[in-house]
Amino acid sequence: MLVATDADWIYDEVDAALGGADTSVLRVRRGVDVVPACKQVEPALVVIDLQIGNMGGMAAATAVRQEQEAGRLADSGVIMLLDRHPDVFLAQTCGADGWLIKPLDAFRVRQAAEAVLGGGTWFEGLPGEGEDVEDPVADVTDDPEATADDPAGGGDDSVVAADAR
């Protein structure tokens, strides 16, 4: 496994959760080093911190996916480590198989890694079930009189409905 972070505490947390006798957790401290490290060690999983120095985590994850799609890099799972819920919007654009929102804990890191390594996904901070994953922000209006049937707000006393798509 490869962890891309310049924060020691993040590497320590991921290593403690995923490292072991049969699993080595390698580290790069700069986003620009992620693709070359992936070419060298061919990790099954790449964990990328959003706030990595030099080249941001989103750019590093996108670069990994582009190299994989071009056939210049072996397939591997990609998990992003996000700082806050609004970062989910950014994470959706980079092709990650999953993401966790900090602060981290070993249990969630293991769950996410197992899901992604098993061919699945792991996403935190998305809307509830049945809602569109591609657009987590529901359409809203500033007009308190507006409803789903009357978005312009004509004084109807019905409850405002969120667009769950």
Show which residues each predicted segment covers:
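Conserved acidic segment of CheY-like receiver
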Residues: M1-L18, V46
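Acidic, metal-coordinating helix/loop segments flanking the phosphotransfer/catalytic sites
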Residues: R29-L45
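His-Asp phosphorelay/catalytic-motif detector in bacterial-type signaling
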Residues: E42-A44, E69-G77
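Conserved phosphotransfer microenvironments
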Residues: A44-Q66
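Two-component signal transduction core modules
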Residues: V46, W99-L100
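Alpha4 helix (beta4-alpha4-beta5 surface) of REC/receiver domains from two-component response regulators
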Residues: A59, M80-G98
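C-terminal output helix
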Residues: L104-A113
